[in-house]
Amino acid sequence: VAVLSGIKNALREHLAKPSQLYWLLTTININLSNDLPIYNINGCSLHFYKFLPKKYRKARESIISEMASWLINKDDSSSYYITARVREKSEYDAATRMLDAIDLLRGIWNLHINKTMVFSFGGRKKPINQVTLGALHTLHDKNGDKASNTFWYDPEHYENHSHVDFAVNAYKTIEFTKNVRKLLKKNSYGKDVEIAIIRYVRALDSQDYDAVVIKLWSILEYLTATLQENYDKTIKRTVFQYSDREYNKQVLEHLRQYRNRSVHLRSGGNDIETHVFQLKSYVEHLLRFHIANHFKFDSLQESAMFMDLQPDKVALKKQIALCRAGISFMTKA
């Protein structure tokens, strides 16, 4: 009882707090030759700068200088700076919302430009994502001063990632982003799809490919609404999307076995890149299916019912006839 009372009091105090504006500052590896628009995503305003805005300079440099040189390097002057702004009751809630908004945008970009297959020849693996954030994220107030002594640092950050140039992208990533955001806005379960996109981009930030396999399989379960189901159901619903179902069933069964080995043994074999990119392709296919939502499903669960249908036209026509007979019977009853 005392514990519950304490939780209720803490919640009451949190809700009573006045909201205030927070700014999160980080870097992103977009080539400075690109002109990026302002994005408003889920109540967060995202702005891009080719140079570090003066009001943040003192606080940002102070944080970097306080850390050991081996931990945090100076900002990359050839990368864009990005600020996110949101009104929230706490630093943690603000940072969480802003990073979610940034990663949703990055997820859409990477869904469009990530490569279908890349092989590395020895050495350290690099993230599959093309668009990545810098290692350091700092929180600021309206004057640019530190809003908190807390900062966010990615110890796995890959330093040598090349810069992305949307200007040479023949497929027009900015236009793709507009279209995806319009579709998500119209989608009845768009917020669920956004969660999947954020999970997708965070999974592919990692250089630990065994961890990537585990995370991608979890996203596959999420997108097929099989988190509480067995593996067979996950595979069955995924292969419904493909004409060559038997082949894809075998591939997914192999990936499932590899995923299980990764959980227990951290296999990291020579073929791990192939497995990562195969699994990534299934996740991306399902993401695009849910983003478009051509059949106007109301939820992930309803889309899962669609994927449970028999992939057989004759059987489906019989099912339709039975449903019509049932409606006729109920009408007469």
List the predicted regions and their residue ranges.
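Short runs of predominantly hydrophobic/aromatic residues within well-ordered alpha helices
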Residues: 193-196, 212-216, 220, 248, ...
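Generic structural signal for hydrophobic core residues of well-folded globular domains
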Residues: 203, 207, 220-227, 286, ...
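A contiguous, mid-protein "functional segment" used to position or interact
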Residues: 274-308
